[in-house]
Design a protein with these regions (language model features):
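Loop/turn-rich, solvent-exposed surfaces of beta-rich toroidal or solenoidal domains
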Residues: 50, 70-119
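Short, solvent-exposed loop/edge segments of extracellular or virion-exposed proteins
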Residues: 178-194
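Loop-centered beta-sheet repeat module
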Residues: 1-39
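Trp- and S/T/G-rich repeat-edge/linker motifs of beta-rich repeat architectures
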Residues: 13-14, 18-26, 60-70, 117-128, ...
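Blade-level signature of beta-propeller repeat domains, shared across WD40, Kelch, NHL, RCC1
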Residues: 137-176
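Structural motif
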Residues: 5-9, 49-54, 103-110, 156-167
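Conserved blade-ending motifs and adjacent loop-strand segments that build the rim/top face
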Residues: 69-77, 118-144
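Entry beta-strands of beta-propeller and related beta-repeat scaffolds
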Residues: 40-43, 87-95, 146-150
Length: 207
């Protein structure tokens, strides 16, 4: 930051922490970052950008930024992990952050499936956390029983911990306990129906 430009770089060790070296700096304006490993590559998610970076050489160099394709609040700390089991036959990265671009509200967990070329294909209908209310700094992890633990700042600016089944995350359920699905089983956030048309929905809730 000494030049007035704020960019993320990595520091790595090849000898179990005896010595440390600085890796390459990413090309875009960025702040603190989180890294996860998947299929032999490193994936870097940074604050101040709706993009991610990929390294094929353990952090020595980084790709140009790759857009996620969805919007989230990048003025907030973010968290990401690689899930230990396959999702739809692919390695899955779980990425958590607030989805409200103007405030730290409406948490989401997005699921990105690693493709053969290293790119991420993001599933539709991210998992909803504290929709419409405060959701700020978070930490996501996998528990010993292969479920997902999410620790985050809630609407009272207190720490809340949720334990979530991976199937609920993949299917886009909600920690608010109630959600709506259309005939195809997709989660619906809103819908407009003309007066001469019909549509059917199913209201579901957590046990």
């Amino acid at each position: 930051y000494t030049s007035g430009v704020q960019r993320t770089s990595t520091i790595y060790s090849d000898d179990e922490g005896i010595t440390w070296h600085r890796g390459a700096t990413v090309s875009g304006n960025s702040s603190e970052a989180v890294i996860t490993e998947a299929d032999g590559r490193l994936y870097l998610f940074v604050r101040m950008s709706n993009a991610y970076y990929i390294s094929e050489d353990d952090g020595l160099t980084w790709s140009e930024p790759k857009e996620t394709g969805f919007k989230y609040n990048n003025n907030c700390q973010l968290s990401a992990i690689t899930y230990s089991k396959k999702v739809n036959g692919k390695t899955a990265i779980l990425f958590a952050g607030p989805s409200d671009t103007s405030a730290r509200n409406s948490g989401r967990i997005w699921v990105g499936l690693v493709q053969d070329d290293g790119s991420l294909q993001w599933l539709d209908n991210p998992y909803v956390v504290n929709d419409g209310t405060h959701y700020a700094y978070s930490c996501i992890t996998e528990t010993s029983d292969a479920q997902i633990g999410l620790l985050y700042e809630d609407e009272d600016e207190q720490l809340e911990f949720d334990k979530i089944a991976i199937d609920d995350i993949v299917n886009g359920a909600a920690t608010s306990g109630v959600w709506v699905e259309n005939d195809n089983g997709a989660v619906v956030n809103s819908s407009v129906i003309n007066t001469d048309a019909t549509a059917s929905y199913v209201v579901r809730c957590l046990d």
